[in-house]
């Protein structure tokens, strides 16, 4: 037998009874950039980087429970450094629980991405290979996370699917590690959690780029139109469809059906959570009713004629409430079917009749059938109920319930906000409903109070009745989600961000589990945008900030531009659009510093940690997705602040400013180790109040690479915000002074005097120079890195 190879073919002589199968044909990768050291990293690939972060930012644990109840050898008491039956201690068990939470979060986003690709093929009738990844002429770095993590620069959605397969495989491997009898080190559990956080960012990018390219969402253009937001924006003269969840394709079919049949004047489409955000990127007449924190208030207000749910952040007891109100529910996703009958294969007319016959709901898993059913059911129900849309309680019922309250205090004990509901009920009984109305916004509508009330008072309905005028008049304005940051924008702001003259990027993201109502979201955005920070925002916090107006009647979205530039408020989109915030930081390294981002995660994360002044805030974070989102930011070198409820995630990453060895970096210019200021000081930290959080966020934008001008600007804001919100100078401001040129010019003499008197620094008053005192001096050529490899081999550039 002779085997001959020729160009493009091979020939085999005398071959019999052989079947030849040709599988996937791999085309040669285009070498647009050198392949970096870590394409498609496994669990252990970036472990050294994780361990560096975990050494500097030591995990601080606050376990919610000292027991482990995960296997039948337990339950095991882990207090007092005891080990469980399997040998695990409390630190490792807490790290394990954190890893489990992150695995749930990353599975939600990655599962969403997989479902998105399936629905795109079904709804468009195209193969993934036929849909190009095209984000317009101003975006060449179309998928910076995908390129950074996998080494793939996608040309079609099929390329994104390859990256998604990698993420899915890695998630399985990490979840395997949380099984009993596997990992035993809290450090390695945290490394695995960081790995999941990175995969979460990848899954989000795949999901959002896919829907942008398939459904024609905005591609990073600024000056986006304003969308109505608030419980008062729904037109009560029309049939009302309420959508809840995060997976938009079924809702897009509703929008198509409304438009194709000319029903815009008859049907109003509104939503809660990320589905609401994404549908407005497709259908501009859609409205955002509320963020997650008001979901139960919206449902119980009875505004909707039909409710359509898909996946994530949907109340598990939604049918319990809708059955009482007679509102049918259509489940469109197999992850949330609520024991309803699957009618996917039924004709739409049969499904419509079934729902109008008074049945509580059904499942429709074909997104192309949802539009007709939802719209026609809503139209029919609107005719049935007429104009009877108002509070669910009568005046007599309201007063009867107010009088029934015995001030037992059970509700306050159950309330995560500690609201003194009984006092508000007593005031209402005496004719003062202002307390209930004021607390309506602080209440996150969890419903726990109703579960413990011995009198069965419908407390949510009481709140809605007292605040009804507020509800019907609540109308704000939100910029439509614009999607990714354009390369052209990065070219303009890369230098100011790295040098510090734009003091930082503030990412306002996450859920609505706020400690004191929704106004905090507005306060954070307005404060930082007014100081020339770049404010980017997504999800529920983006919605809630839109509900408030300044003295001139403008929301933050009307007051500030939406370019990625100083003083901008940029509404990126839904939860999965958070990936574009990661992407912006990566693009700074790629476009401004000319670093090679292809499969080069560790080096780019090192660059961001040392140079890109960015800080995330998830003030109302509640979900496992929020945990994996924050952990993904952390692995990339971006710190995050959470609200007081965020301590329930059980873990913080706190720096120790006093520990010299934690703050040693290499100066690539000289090869020597240098002790730097604690910048950024923490990687994940909970703040108790908004007054504590705002100065903390400004502090977490300090970076070792700041120029003197940039450091002076950042110190000005840090000191000013501390004086404004905490009424005192920050205790640690002097740690960030390297030279007198770092000091805010307007307070230079005052601060030099304080450095001399309070901190013992030596000052040459004749020259007004610092002679002795700083942790380190300033050198314009300082080139910080934490990676020995980069000292040895140099930085990868393109």
From Swiss-Prot:
It catalyses: CO + 2 oxidized [2Fe-2S]-[ferredoxin] + H2O = 2 reduced [2Fe-2S]-[ferredoxin] + CO2 + 2 H(+). [Ni-4Fe-4S] cluster binds at residues 246, 274, 313, 511, 540, 575. Its cofactor is [4Fe-4S] cluster; [Ni-4Fe-4S] cluster. GO terms for molecular function: 4 iron, 4 sulfur cluster binding; anaerobic carbon-monoxide dehydrogenase activity; hydroxylamine reductase activity; iron ion binding; nickel cation binding; peroxidase activity. Binds 7 [4Fe-4S] clusters per heterotetramer. [4Fe-4S] cluster 2 binds at residues 68, 71, 76, 86. [4Fe-4S] cluster 3 binds at residues 405, 408, 411, 453. [4Fe-4S] cluster 4 binds at residues 415, 443, 446, 449. CO binds at residue 109. Its EC number is 1.2.7.4. Keywords: 4Fe-4S, Iron, Iron-sulfur, Metal-binding, Nickel, Oxidoreductase, Repeat. InterPro entries: 4Fe4S_Fe-S-bd, 4Fe4S_Fe_S_CS, CdhA, CO_DH_a-bundle, HCP/CODH, Prismane-like_a/b-sand, Prismane-like_sf. Belongs to the Ni-containing carbon monoxide dehydrogenase family. Cluster B is an all-cysteinyl-liganded 4Fe-4S cluster; cluster C is a mixed Ni-Fe-S cluster which is the active site of CO oxidation. Cluster D is also an all-cysteinyl-liganded 4Fe-4S cluster that bridges the two subunits of the CODH dimer. Contains two additional 4Fe-4S clusters, dubbed E and F, that probably transport electrons from ferredoxin to the B cluster. HAMAP family: CdhA (MF_01137). NCBIfam families: cdhA. Heterotetramer of two alpha and two epsilon subunits. The ACDS complex is made up of alpha, epsilon, beta, gamma and delta subunits with a probable stoichiometry of (alpha(2)epsilon(2))(4)-beta(8)-(gamma(1)delta(1))(8). This is Acetyl-CoA decarbonylase/synthase complex subunit alpha 2. It comes from Archaeoglobus fulgidus (strain ATCC 49558 / DSM 4304 / JCM 9628 / NBRC 100126 / VC-16). The gene is cdhA2.
């Amino acid at each position: 037998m002779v085997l001959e190879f020729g160009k493009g073919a091979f020939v085999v002589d005398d071959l019999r009874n052989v079947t030849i199968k040709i599988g996937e044909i791999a085309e040669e990768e285009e070498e647009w950039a050198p392949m970096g050291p870590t394409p498609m990293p496994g669990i252990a690939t970036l472990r050294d980087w994780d361990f560096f972060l975990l050494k500097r930012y030591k995990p601080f644990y606050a376990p919610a429970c000292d027991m482990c109840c995960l296997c039948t050898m337990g339950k095991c008491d882990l207090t007092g450094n005891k080990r469980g039956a399997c040998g695990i201690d409390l630190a490792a068990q807490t790290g394990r629980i954190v890893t489990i939470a992150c695995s749930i979060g990353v599975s939600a986003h990655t599962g969403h991405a997989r479902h998105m690709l399936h629905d795109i093929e079904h709804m468009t009738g195209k193969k993934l290979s036929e849909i190009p990844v095209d984000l317009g002429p101003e975006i060449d770095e179309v998928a910076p996370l995908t390129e950074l993590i996998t080494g793939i620069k996608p040309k079609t959605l099929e390329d994104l699917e390859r990256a998604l397969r990698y993420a899915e495989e890695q998630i399985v491997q990490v979840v395997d590690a949380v099984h009993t009898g596997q990992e035993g080190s809290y450090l390695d559990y945290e490394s695995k959690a960081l790995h999941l956080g990175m995969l979460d960012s990848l899954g989000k990018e795949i999901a959002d780029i896919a829907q942008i390219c398939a459904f024609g969402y905005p591609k990073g253009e600024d000056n986006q139109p304003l969308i109505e937001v608030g419980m008062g924006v729904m037109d009560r003269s029309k049939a009302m469809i309420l959508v809840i969840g995060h997976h938009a394709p079924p809702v897009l079919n509703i929008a198509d059906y409304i438009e194709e049949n000319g029903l815009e004047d008859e049907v109003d489409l509104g939503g809660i959570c990320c589905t609401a955000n994404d549908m407005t990127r497709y259908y501009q007449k859609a409205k955002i009713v509320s963020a997650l924190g008001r979901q139960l208030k919206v449902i119980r207000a009875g505004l909707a004629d039909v409710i359509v749910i898909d996946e994530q952040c949907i109340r598990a007891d939604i049918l319990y409430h809708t059955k009482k109100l007679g509102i049918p529910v259509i489940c469109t996703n197999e992850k949330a079917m609520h024991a309803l009958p699957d009618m996917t294969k039924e004709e739409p007319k049969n499904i419509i009749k079934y729902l109008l016959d008074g049945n509580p709901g059904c499942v429709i898993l074909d997104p192309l059938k949802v539009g007709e059913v939802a719209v026609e059911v809503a139209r029919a129900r609107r005719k049935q109920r007429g104009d009877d849309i108002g509070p669910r309680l009568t005046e007599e019922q309201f007063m009867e319930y107010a009088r029934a309250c015995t001030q037992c205090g059970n509700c306050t004990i159950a309330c995560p906000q500690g609201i003194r509901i009984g006092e508000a009920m007593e005031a209402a009984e005496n004719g003062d409903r202002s307390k209930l109305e004021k607390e309506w916004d602080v209440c996150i509508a969890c419903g726990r109070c109703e579960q413990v009330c011995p009198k069965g008072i419908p407390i949510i309905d009481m709140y809605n009745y007292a605040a009804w005028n507020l509800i019907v008049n609540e109308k704000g304005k939100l910029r439509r989600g614009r999607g990714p940051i354009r390369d052209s924008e990065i070219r303009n702001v890369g230098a100011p961000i790295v040098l510090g003259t734009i003091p930082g990027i503030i990412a306002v993201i996450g859920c609505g589990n706020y400690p004191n109502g929704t106004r905090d979201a507005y306060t954070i955005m307005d404060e930082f945008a007014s100081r020339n920070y770049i404010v980017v925002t997504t999800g529920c916090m983006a919605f809630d900030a839109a509900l408030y107006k300044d003295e001139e009647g403008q929301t933050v979205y009307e007051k500030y531009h939406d370019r990625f530039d100083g003083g901008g408020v940029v509404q990126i989109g839904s939860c999965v659009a958070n990936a574009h915030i990661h992407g912006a930081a990566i693009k700074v390294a790629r476009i401004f510093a000319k670093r090679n981002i292809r499969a080069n995660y560790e080096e780019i994360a090192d660059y961001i940690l040392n140079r890109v002044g960015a800080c995330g805030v998830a003030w109302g974070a509640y979900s496992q997705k929020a945990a994996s989102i924050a952990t993904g930011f952390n692995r990339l070198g971006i710190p995050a602040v959470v609200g007081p409820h965020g301590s329930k995630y059980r873990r913080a990453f706190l720096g120790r400013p006093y520990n010299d060895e934690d703050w040693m970096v290499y100066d690539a210019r000289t090869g020597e180790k240098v002790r730097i200021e604690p910048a950024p000081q923490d990687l994940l930290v909970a703040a108790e109040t908004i007054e504590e959080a705002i100065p903390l966020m400004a502090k977490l934008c300090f970076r070792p690479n700041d120029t003197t001008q940039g450091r002076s600007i950042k110190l000005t804001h840090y000191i000013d915000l501390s004086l404004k919100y905490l009424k005192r100078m920050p205790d640690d401001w002097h740690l960030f002074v390297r030279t007198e040129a770092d000091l805010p010019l307007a307070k230079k003499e005052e601060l030099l005097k304080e450095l001399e008197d309070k901190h013992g620094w030596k000052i040459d008053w004749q020259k007004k120079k610092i002679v002795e005192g700083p942790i380190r001096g300033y050198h314009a050529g300082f080139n910080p890195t934490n990676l020995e490899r980069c000292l040895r081999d140099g930085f990868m550039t393109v």
